[in-house]
Amino acid sequence: MARNSISDELIIETSARLSNKVGLDNLSLKMIAEELDIKSPSLYNHISSLDDIKEKLMIYGWKELGEKAIDSAVGVSGYDALRKMCYAFYDYTINNKGVFQAMLWYNKFKSDEMANATIKIFGILHKILEPLNISSNNVEHIIRTLRSFLEGFSLLVNNNSFGNPISIKESFDLSLDIIINGIKSLEGVD
């Protein structure tokens, strides 16, 4: 690959692909450079460290997930849209294990760039929930609950932590039904 064809975007996309393949903890600058057919020091023209790449992977993942979640909810509204977004989240996280690992330590209050990474997904959740006559305070609690469930469930699946032979899909479906029924109980409550 020609040296001048290396871009920040290509480095992050390559890092995402590699982290999904070998795991975020096994990702190295040497591995990324080899994949790009460049020498490791050349990466420093674009990034400052492996931690910098991991932070960019986190932002990349949240943005990509936001697009997929929004696409999943096109043409539906209310609880159907919420359900479709949850399935899109789950599908993304189990199919992008390395990127998801980077996304886990997201804190939107760390920087404006991080806050902007999730603006789409959290914005659409607000748009779905607010017409359901749910208070803005409860919407924030619901978003935390959804994030905790989706990230936690996906993390357990990705680490093969469900040893019971019952269907993981059935467990996910039932858990989501329980959460949605709980959300419905908050309609009209301050």
What are these model-predicted stretches?
Residues 90-112, 153-163:
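Amphipathic alpha-helical segments used for helix-helix packing
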Residues 11-19, 61, 65, 89, ...:
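Short hydrophobic clusters on alpha-helical segments that form packing/core surfaces
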Residues 59-84, 122-131:
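Amphipathic alpha-helical linker/stalk segments
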Residues 108-136, 140-144, 170-181:
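Amphipathic alpha-helical packing segments from all-alpha helical-bundle domains
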Residues 70-98, 136, 142-146:
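Hydrophobic alpha-helical connector segments
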Residues 102, 148-165, 180-189:
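Amphipathic C-terminal alpha-helical segment
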